[in-house]
Regions:
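Short, acidic/turn-prone active-site loops that include or flank metal/cofactor-
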Residues: 16-21, 127-128
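ATP-binding N-terminal substructure of ATP-dependent carboxylate-amine bond-forming enzymes
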Residues: 1-17, 49
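ATP-dependent carboxylate/phosphate-activation module, predominantly the ATP-grasp catalytic core
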Residues: 101-167, 171, 178-182, 186-189, ...
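Short glycine-/acidic-enriched loop or helix-start segments at secondary-structure transitions
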Residues: 1-3, 73-74, 109, 206
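Short polybasic/polar patches that bind polyanions
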Residues: 6, 33, 56, 163, ...
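A short, flexible beta-alpha/helix-coil linker loop
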Residues: 11, 68-71, 200-203
Length: 224
C-alpha cells in the first residue's frame, strides 16, 4: 500500500521512503529513542571479532535475529562462545542480522486503531508471559491474553510511539518489554522499554480475541 500511495501521491499514510523505519529493527530504535523510550544496546552483525567485542561490552547472553524479520523466525539466543560459533555457521549469508543485549522481560503490547489525524480510536493490549523466541525455538505452546484494562504506562509509551513514528490510519501492534529485573541503562523491574513496532494488527486470532474480551468489533471500527 505504501507503493501505491507513493505512485499516486496519496498522503493518507506511509510512502515507500517511510518503510525502513517501520520494517528494520535497527531503524526503529532511533524513533523509540526520540519518543523517550529506552532501547536495548545493539550491534549489526559483521564479523566474529566484531560480535565478540560487542559481547565483551554487554556480556552473555545476547540475541541475534534478522534485522527485517517477523515472528522470531531464525532468532538465536547466544549464551557462550560455542553458541556464537554455531550462530555464524548457521546464519543465512544473504540476511542482515542485528545482535542485542538480552533483556529479561515480559512482552506487553499496545494494540490500537489510529484515525487519519494520528489519534487512537480504540486501544487495548496483550501480555505474553512466555517468550515468543523460546516458543519458536523450543516448539513450546504459545500463551497470551488480552488485558481488560490497558496499563497507564503502556498507554503512555504506545501513544508516544504513534507520535514519534507519525502513524495515521493504521491498525497497529506495538511490542514492549516489561522488565522482570533491574537492567542497567534500561530501567528498574516493572519498567517498560521498547521492543518493536508492527504497523498491522497482531497476528492469528488476536483481533477476534480482542472482540470477545471487549465486547466490540475491531473490524467495524477499522472499516469506519
Amino acid at each position: 500500500d505504501a507503493m501505491l500511495r507513493t505512485d499516486f501521491n496519496i498522503t493518507t499514510g506511509f510512502h515507500t521512503d517511510d518503510i525502513p523505519r517501520i520494517k528494520f529493527k535497527s531503524k526503529m530504535k532511533e524513533f523509540y529513542t526520540k519518543a523517550g523510550i529506552p532501547v536495548a544496546k545493539h550491534h549489526m552483525v559483521d564479523t566474529l571479532e566484531g560480535c565478540q567485542k560487542f559481547i565483551k561490552e554487554v556480556g552473555y547472553p545476547v540475541v541475534a535475529k534478522p534485522d527485517n524479520g517477523v515472528g522470531a523466525s531464525h532468532t538465536f539466543k547466544i549464551e557462550s562462545d560455542e553458541q556464537l560459533a554455531t550462530f555464524f555457521a548457521e546464519k543465512w549469508d544473504e540476511t542482515i542480522y542485528i545482535m542485542e543485549e538480552y533483556v529479561y522481560g515480559e512482552v506487553n503490547s499496545y494494540d490500537a486503531i489510529i484515525d487519519s489525524n494520528g489519534v487512537p480510536m480504540f486501544e487495548t493490549g496483550n501480555v505474553t508471559p512466555a517468550s515468543i523466541m523460546d516458543v519458536v525455538n523450543n516448539e513450546d505452546d504459545s500463551l497470551f491474553y488480552i488485558v481488560k484494562d490497558l496499563p497507564d504506562d503502556v498507554r503512555k509509551v504506545g501513544r508516544a510511539t504513534i507520535e514519534s513514528f507519525g502513524v495515521k490510519s493504521r491498525f497497529v501492534h506495538f511490542e514492549f518489554f516489561r522488565l522482570l529485573e533491574d537492567h542497567e541503562g534500561l530501567g528498574k523491574k516493572g519498567d517498560v522499554m521498547a521492543l518493536e513496532v508492527n504497523m498491522r494488527p497482531c497476528g492469528g486470532f488476536t483481533p477476534d480475541m480482542i472482540n470477545f474480551a471487549h465486547s466490540t468489533d475491531v473490524y467495524k471500527i477499522w472499516a469506519d
